[in-house]
Amino acid sequence: MSNEILYILLPDYAAHEIVYLSQAIASDEFALKENPKYVNKAVAPTMELVKSIGGFRTLPDYSFETMPDDYAALVLIGGFGWTTPVAEQVVPIVQQAIEKGKIVGAICNGASFMAKHGFLNAVKHTGNGLEQLQLWGGHNYTHPDGYVHAQAICDKNIVTANGSATLEFAKELLLLLENETPERIEMYYQFNKQGFCLLSGKQ
């Protein structure tokens, strides 16, 4: 199995939703890892620069046509691109990932996209509220009873989260990937959730 984590970035993607996960993959609290267990790779519709909501431009490692068939995880980063026709090109990518038992993460509108195409019908899940999942999903979303009102949920290799849950999303994926020990992942989560001053006892 490849050790690459593939991040799907559509035009106007939400850059902040990548940060906690990708940083923990590539570094520890002191420096870049010399031999990381996984490697971050950006995937976009083409090899052209893809722009974030905030205006940052990312040069992708792969396009939809050149991305590998084997990888460790597929992560759908939220943003406004999921409401556009280009998002439909991601349907077979996700379908293949689920069929192969790959780890799939989807946050914010990425989770709504999953609902729209019936990918959440066999798992417990969350997202930007049940109403949005039903609005996006229509008749294809048949599992509202599986919705959990939580920041992030992991079930059967699928992790979903709402757009405010970037840290919780990262935590669930890091645990599923076994990127570090559960204790170190919890430490990373608490440090970023609580903040240095609170954890160090300083005012």
Region roles according to the model:
Residues S2-A14, Y20, S27-T46, F56, ...:
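Active-site-adjacent pocket-lining segments in enzyme domains
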Residues I53:
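A short, charged, and often flexible helix/loop element on the N-terminal side
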